[in-house]
Design a protein with these regions (language model features):
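N-terminal charged segments
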Residues: 6-12, 19, 40-122, 139
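Conserved acetyl-CoA-binding loop-helix of GNAT-fold acetyltransferases
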Residues: 110-119, 237-240, 246-263, 281-286
Length: 302
């Protein structure tokens, strides 16, 4: 509620997902991913808005839209703009949050831009990576070629896949009813995730995003993470105890997360899978995720 020109109350609406209500402040995540804070004292009324009917066909998306959605799902601790490039750092936790996202022109000659990049990461005692996408309209094949010509090496490649969310939520996965959903990763979740040298840093990084959910099966048999951002639900960190593989647990985790994302109004899904992970690729094939584009992390020459 705000004061109008005449001094009388003027009412405004905010539509989104209530992601927290703490110390008298409501945090609402809008469909575009923007977060809005509302003082409890200014709240006049609230109601549940039914989710739009879920789309059953595969979603359409541009490379830039997906790149920005993915970036919001793995947010850095610090970032700096260089023209249309974003330099990101997070103390080395994940390449995605510790690489340049080059969505356009850096605004200066490429050699000067790369010099700025390597210097920026060196000051943080981090290797310099540039995330380059290929295989879709608007991707960066030319930039990749220029980096290779300058001695940068592609170390890791991953597919970005997309699909309709509703079929993931509808999949027959009895263990989905056992999945525990939380807003923060607990010790059991982090223990199964395994890629953690600094638990405090991991927790700080993993909870960042528009609307983040963590899924855990009892005993840490399987885990997953999902970030709901407008129409998109992004799946990550789907990990299964090796002793319980081929039991449908990864599917169960994804089904439980998908159902929660559908409740929040999402209709489309995305995920990233490294190209040398045939087991995960087979899982996502079965859930009808299709490749949208591929990205590569190029590392600066030593």
């Amino acid at each position: 509620m705000e004061a109008g020109l005449s001094g009388s109350p003027e009412f405004t609406d905010t539509v989104g997902v209530l992601t927290s209500w703490d110390q008298g402040v409501l945090l609402i995540t809008k469909k575009d991913g923007q977060s809005v804070r509302i003082s409890e004292s200014s709240l006049v009324a609230g109601k549940i808005v039914p989710a739009a009917p879920a789309r059953r066909r595969g979603p359409a998306a541009s490379f830039e839209e997906l790149s920005r959605v993915a970036a919001r799902a793995w947010q850095p601790l610090e970032s700096e703009r260089l023209g249309d490039w974003t330099l990101r750092a997070a103390a080395g936790f994940t390449r995605r949050a510790n690489s340049v996202l080059p969505l356009g022109d850096p605004g200066i000659p490429l050699d000067d831009a790369l010099a700025r990049v390597t210097s920026w990461y060196a000051r943080r005692s981090l290797p310099a990576y540039v995330q380059v996408a290929t295989g879709a309209a608007g991707t960066q094949e030319m930039l990749g070629a220029e980096l290779e010509r300058r001695g940068w090496a592609s170390e890791v490649s991953a597919e970005v896949r997309i699909g309709s969310l509703a079929p993931v939520g509808d999949v027959d996965a009895p263990a989905a009813d056992e999945v525990r959903l939380t807003r923060v990763p607990d010790e059991e979740w982090l223990g199964r995730y395994g890629r953690v040298s600094d638990p405090d840093l991991a927790r700080r990084m993993l909870v960042e995003g528009p609307s983040v959910w963590f899924a855990t099966l009892p005993g840490g048999r399987a885990i997953g993470r999902c970030v709901v951002d407008g129409r998109w639900a992004g799946f990550a960190a789907v990990t299964v105890d090796p002793a319980h593989r081929r039991e449908g647990l990864a599917t169960a985790v994804m089904a439980a997360l998908a159902r929660r994302a559908l409740e929040e109004g999402a209709s489309a899904a995305w995920l990233q899978v490294e190209t040398d992970n045939p087991g995960a690729s087979a899982l996502y094939d079965g859930l009808r995720f299709a490749r949208h584009h591929t990205y590569h992390h190029y590392r600066a020459a030593s």
